[in-house]
Amino acid sequence: MVLRSLASPAALTDPKRCASVVGVAAFAVRREHAPDALGGPPGLPAPRGFRAAFAAAYAVAYLAGGERRMLRLIRRYGPIMTMPILSLGDVAIVSDSALAKEVFTAPTDVLLGGEGVGPAAAIYGSGSMFVQEEPEHLRRRKLLTPPLHGAALDRYVPIIENSTRAAMHTWPVDRPFAMLTVARSLMLDVIVKVIFGVDDPEEVRRLGRPFERLLNLGVSEQLTVRYALRRLGALRVWPARARANTEIDDVVMALIAQRRADPRLGERHDVLSLLVSARGESGEQLSDSEIRDDLITLVLAGHETTATTLAWAFDLLLHHPDALRRVRAEAVGGGEAFTTAVINETLRVRPPAPLTARVAAQPLTIGGYRVEAGTRIVVHIIAINRSAEVYEHPHEFRPERFLGTRPQTYAWVPFGGGVKRCLGANFSMRELITVLHVLLREGEFTAVDDEPERIVRRSIMLVPRRGTRVRFRPAR
């Protein structure tokens, strides 16, 4: 009876039913899973003997209800709560900025960031910097940092501008289309040019195609299902992923060899060339396989999240005309302050990823509660970004809140935090500002739909339900 109730999508959305389900389950184990004698966090019940069934029911409920349901649970149980979830095991969900700071600043041998990557590791690959633990992660990160920060970003601006203009020439005029769809193509074009240093359109398409195939697998429900069934070999035997990786190897390894043999390597400024030239503290180079793995990581991570953010920014701007006018004024007259505030606010209310995670390698204390080894600790980005304790009118789109002030480190976490914070955050911000300015300076856009888009989950991403439908015409 309890299990059937939990499996129902209504069970964790209706407060009365949620309370009754929890109460019945609590009776079965003598009490609801509240802070126990050892100081464990509160959370959903999972009676001994039925734990796997409850974990499956909770997983189904989450997949059916997504972040809306999770936010209701967070409001019920507080800033840290626990629940078992099929394929993830014991999960502790952190939804408070102070506790997020504890997670992000914990020793790297206590909380493992690579283990926390979860389903995405199946797409990035076991050699990706994302899934490495310390000290290997830090070694690779230091070598990858220079091409994505500081003066290097300025060199990419003309590439981004030219790609944006070229893309606009292919868009339908005065007919509805999904901004998310064209943003994906645009961002892939940009990232391929920036990373590989190519500009011939046919070569860009040839390099981009296998990455696009791999990325499509990463944003499909197939990834979610295969990750849940990974112990049955669903990830080991995945022909579509194997084909995409083989195609990537064919194009990338050949490019690496060409670049190593290039006598003018030192004059090039693309990311591939900088990685081939990079030397560690002891003079060591990255191997071909390490470069390949990191290039895959950069292409995939720098593509979908940025495209999704651009689509969300358009959805919000087109339904907030005053903000749209201010961004357009900066695009035409110069300045970036309000545009930056718009992107920060977009990432606050519409982060492309709902969460980031670590795995406890040993017992630790978070928020005064004991968390056992093996627990997956999930920092819930949406809950933290929309905290009423930090933000006035937290659910409203108000870019002005970020004018003249930087987002708080642990109360604004769309890029994660700690040593695993997104390496490409600065590049993403520069890319979004540049693309927005070109589009709004050289194009006119209107919303197709009267109401803002609903958030829906696509695998590990949160995207606009209809892809942000717009009408476009070149500016007069």
Swiss-Prot record:
Enzyme Commission no: 1.14.-.-
Residue pairs linked by disulfide bridges in the UniProt entry: none
Molecular function GO labels: heme binding; iron ion binding; monooxygenase activity; oxidoreductase activity; oxidoreductase activity, acting on paired donors, with incorporation or reduction of molecular oxygen
Cofactor(s) annotated in UniProt: heme
Class in the EC hierarchy, top level: oxidoreductase
Record-linked Pfam families: p450
Keyword annotations: Heme, Iron, Metal-binding, Monooxygenase, Oxidoreductase
InterPro entries: Cyt_P450, Cyt_P450_CS, Cyt_P450_E_grp-I, Cyt_P450_sf, Cytochrome_P450_monoxygenase
CDD domains named among the record's database cross-references: CYP110-like (cd11053)
Coiled-coil annotated spans: none
Residues the entry annotates as binding heme: C422
Any one annotated GO CC term: plasma membrane
Recorded family membership: Belongs to the cytochrome P450 family.
PANTHER family noted in UniProt: CYTOCHROME P450, CYTOCHROME P450 12A4, MITOCHONDRIAL-RELATED
Protein name per UniProt: Putative cytochrome P450 137
Organism: Mycobacterium tuberculosis (strain ATCC 25618 / H37Rv)
